[in-house]
């Protein structure tokens, strides 16, 4: 499966815009924690397998019971673990979306239903998803069960909020309706909020407030995107169902969160003012990049995330790569694989510093002028 950030297979890359991270880089506190001499002295110890200190700190962030939080070696591990725990007969993914959901569902042999988001609606999830015959109702048909036990559920729904690669958040009112529908129809709802902390008004748009009333709701998040630390694999999952938590933990290896990851996570959570600064940077740089791309005649899709998706009839990936700049061409993502009729491609660029974003825009402009 293709991901952004494959700098190891692409030599001589100077600027990597193919990954979606906080544009201001990791917090100073994280760098300090990793370089701390005290941590080097802990190399001979096993990490806390229950990551108690980290879980306690995480519970204060969304104000949840500590026991509702599970941590893992990145969000990817947790997505695989929850799918292996539930083993759904079938699942639904609105597309375009993150490709990793398909991978974990294929691993357990689940039948995957795809709901195509419409380009003319900016690839936004709308009320049609609830009302149309090919939407959520198609997943619920004949799959009702009695209890929210992992082994008894036949269905899962995956939503990425804000959505990757588009960058758009689901309207909170619609998301609440979807969550309630899933609860009533015994469908496990996985909401991927790995970019949520970087969007404006994140608290209002997050589904964490609904966990207490919905045992079928599962929220996944990660330090990777929010704190720009993908090299330290650290993700977490929030869910209120005790049965499902036990089932997920049975799928995880022991000590899945290293000592380095636990210390880095604690340092990130303790970085005062970081999220406010990161959100301001995302808003400003997104506005700048979208404006410049539109001035060049690109079709740019609205969103709030730290990345921008656009459509270009001009080939950009190869020429930019030759200049040492890596962007994401979305040809491998279901729903945005380009258009043979138009002869173009969808691209996604992660936001970086203002100076780096200026450099990318100038490079694209030069290519268009050729």
Roles of regions detected by a PLM:
Residues 1-45, 141:
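N-terminal "arm"/small-domain region of PLP-dependent enzymes with the aminotransferase-like
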Residues 25-27, 100, 216-301:
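PLP-dependent aminotransferase class I/II
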Residues 59-81, 94:
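Short loop-beta-helix segment that forms the pyridoxal 5′-phosphate
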Residues 85-106, 111:
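Conserved PLP-anchoring active-site segment centered on the Schiff-base-forming lysine
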Residues 108, 184-185, 214, 296:
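Helix C-cap/helix->beta junction micro-motif
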Residues 119-199:
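Active-site phosphate-binding strand-loop segment of PLP-dependent enzymes
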Residues 173, 333-370:
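PLP-dependent enzyme catalytic core of the Aspartate aminotransferase-like
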Residues 295-324:
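Conserved PLP-binding catalytic core of the aspartate aminotransferase-like
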